[in-house]
């Protein structure tokens, strides 16, 4: 599937001059509210959430090729971003219905690909929870849903970034060794599926195919994968798609995420960048709540800057241009 010139131009706006997507993710809503609530007794306000997103955008977008925001709380932050920083906007509702089976996808009802584009987005991003081992009844609904969004994005001639998060309803803890054993197949098979032309996905935003905390040499406890087994899972991931793909940071520490990217590269993965969120800015939340705006700004200018600068340095030697795909 060849991309239109407009889509190519839009993805270029989201990338650096080397064709690598070094994007800052701050479309968190439910997760952010929970993080903020850990440091204050009252419910986080809309004003607090919006202001924190603005602070991160003002201080860090000069070092990112693009920023991912949500249209619920992130529009002031989109206006505050650096002029050279591209914009992705999230199209999905945050979280999923824990009382219903299947983690079915849901769009923000007052938004469309057209409206996100009119808001200034260079790409539409949608998050899908997917388990290749779920029932066909569940998965056929998800496939149809993604086909719809893909068609919308084709109609609007705007890139479609699909984020896939894997799960297993029979393994409630996705950080467990039990889930680590099934994760590689789930991640790589989902990538293979959504690379099919019928979905019109332009860029995949994906998990790394292993839990690095269980890789030999990275693990402090139980080892699920030897280094060579882990490396093979990265190679299998690379072979699973012809599309550009970028890694999400999944809330791990900045140091572990950077080490993961080095391991991926050394394994032979031709990934095309990152959408890195909490690994860059999470420490600012506590400072913002407990010490205020100016202290949070100072944190972002020092620790936050170091996190994103170190990440950019790692990307220079590990990621490859999406234009090679």
Swiss-Prot record:
Q: Which PANTHER family match?
A: SULFOFRUCTOSEPHOSPHATE ALDOLASE (PTHR39340:SF1)
What family, per the record? Belongs to the aldolase LacD family.
**Per the record's keyword annotation, is Chloroplast included, yes or no?**
no
Pathway per its UniProt entry is:
Carbohydrate metabolism; D-tagatose 6-phosphate degradation; D-glyceraldehyde 3-phosphate and glycerone phosphate from D-tagatose 6-phosphate: step 2/2
User: What would you give as a GO molecular function for this chain, any one?
Assistant: tagatose-bisphosphate aldolase activity
Q: What class of enzyme is it?
A: lyase
Alphabetical list of SUPFAM superfamilies matching this protein: Aldolase (SSF51569)
Q: Which UniProt keywords apply?
A: Lactose metabolism, Lyase
As recorded in UniProt, its EC number(s) are 4.1.2.40
Q: Which organism is it from?
A: Staphylococcus epidermidis (strain ATCC 12228 / FDA PCI 1200)
Q: What is the lineage of its organism?
A: Bacteria, Bacillati, Bacillota, Bacilli, Bacillales
User: What reaction does this catalyse?
Assistant: D-tagatofuranose 1,6-bisphosphate = D-glyceraldehyde 3-phosphate + dihydroxyacetone phosphate
Key word Hydrolase present: no
> Where, by residue number, does the polypeptide cross the bilayer?
none
* UniProt name for this protein: Tagatose 1,6-diphosphate aldolase
Which Gene3D superfamilies does the entry link to?
Aldolase class I (3.20.20.70)
BP GO annotations: 6-sulfoquinovose(1-) catabolic process; D-tagatose 6-phosphate catabolic process; lactose catabolic process via tagatose-6-phosphate
């Amino acid at each position: 599937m060849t991309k239109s010139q407009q889509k190519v131009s839009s993805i270029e706006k989201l990338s650096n001059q080397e064709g690598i997507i070094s994007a800052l993710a701050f479309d968190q809503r439910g997760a952010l509210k929970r993080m903020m609530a850990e440091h204050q007794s009252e419910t986080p306000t809309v004003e607090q959430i919006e202001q924190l997103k603005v602070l991160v955008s003002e201080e860090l977008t000069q070092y990112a090729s693009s920023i991912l925001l949500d249209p619920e709380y992130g529009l002031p932050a989109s206006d505050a971003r650096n002029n050279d920083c591209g914009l992705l906007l999230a199209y999905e509702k945050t979280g999923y219905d824990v009382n219903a089976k299947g983690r079915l996808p849901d769009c923000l009802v007052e938004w469309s690909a057209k409206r996100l584009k009119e808001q200034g987005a260079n790409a539409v991003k949608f998050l899908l929870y997917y388990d290749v081992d779920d029932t066909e009844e569940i998965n056929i609904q998800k496939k149809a849903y993604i086909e719809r969004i893909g068609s919308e994005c084709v109609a609007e001639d705007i890139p479609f970034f699909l984020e896939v998060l894997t799960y297993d309803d029979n393994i409630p803890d996705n950080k467990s060794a039990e889930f680590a054993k099934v994760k590689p197949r789930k991640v790589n098979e989902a990538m293979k599926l959504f690379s099919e032309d019928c979905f019109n996905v332009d860029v995949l935003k994906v998990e790394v195919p292993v839990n690095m905390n269980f890789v030999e040499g990275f693990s402090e406890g139980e080892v699920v994968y030897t280094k060579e087994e882990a490396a093979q899972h990265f190679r299998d991931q690379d072979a699973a798609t012809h599309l550009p793909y970028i890694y999400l940071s999944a809330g791990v520490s900045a140091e572990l995420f950077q080490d993961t990217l080095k391991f991926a590269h050394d394994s032979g993965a031709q990934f095309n960048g990152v959408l890195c969120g909490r690994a860059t800015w999470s420490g600012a939340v506590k400072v913002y709540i407990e010490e205020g705006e100016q202290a949070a700004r100072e944190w972002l200018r020092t620790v936050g800057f170091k996190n994103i600068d170190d990440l950019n340095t790692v990307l220079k030697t590990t990621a490859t241009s999406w234009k090679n795909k």
